[in-house]
């Protein structure tokens, strides 16, 4: 999904990584020394409290939108409004509208931004031609301009890692919630056990990962919980290789978990 908003998120992540690395000249610091990563994860980030209100919010009222297509001819993102952030930071998110442009469910194997299935034959679809759209973020707009993204989960790390190319394999534990719209009942199921050698030094570094998709969608809007479970931690390695996940589990949920937090991350100069 090479859309302007994803490009902005990638640019933001790359810039934060560069700033983080400038603070330390060593590239092999032990994993427990993680303060620079904490700074990266929280930079330009607001988190909600138990009342779904972003703490210290100072950006005024903003629209929450679900993007479903990109018009390359007009350099325009197509979206529907699904909620609002009020001036006091209160979040009201309740998708109800139909999504007008969808892709067939079976295309998920080519558009899965979690990149956790190695063999596309692992996917099993029910009603594979049903229209489908999944986003693990909500765009935040003011005056027809994107000012940031809103994610939902129980970890500031996971909600960033799983949206950042190159970081999706990290083993920080927790979950992110995705919003899915389908125009017919359908399903994605997959199970994959993968073993691989991550070493680039000649000394084997074998890991095993397990990935499960158990997604039986009802017509309309659905919530998917993607949980990172178990961690391979690699000490004395560059920060960008500090860990790998042991398991990803993708399941449907009927409501937002009680321990979930909204994370707003600004983009550009906003």
Language-model-derived ranges and their functions:
Residues 41-76:
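Short, ordered, surface-exposed loop/turn motifs in non-cytosolic proteins
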Residues 29-47, 87-93:
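Acidic, serine/threonine-rich, charge-biased low-complexity segments
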Residues 75-84, 147, 212:
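Local beta-strand/beta-hairpin segments that build beta-sheet-rich folds
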Residues 1-35, 269-270:
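Sec-dependent signal peptide cleavage junction
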Residues 96-198:
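Long, low-complexity intrinsically disordered regions in eukaryotic proteins
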Residues 62-64, 81-97:
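Glycine-centered loop-to-beta-strand initiation motif
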Residues 176-270:
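Extracytoplasmic cysteine-anchoring/structural motifs
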Residues 85-86, 172, 256:
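Short, ordered beta-strand-loop transition motifs
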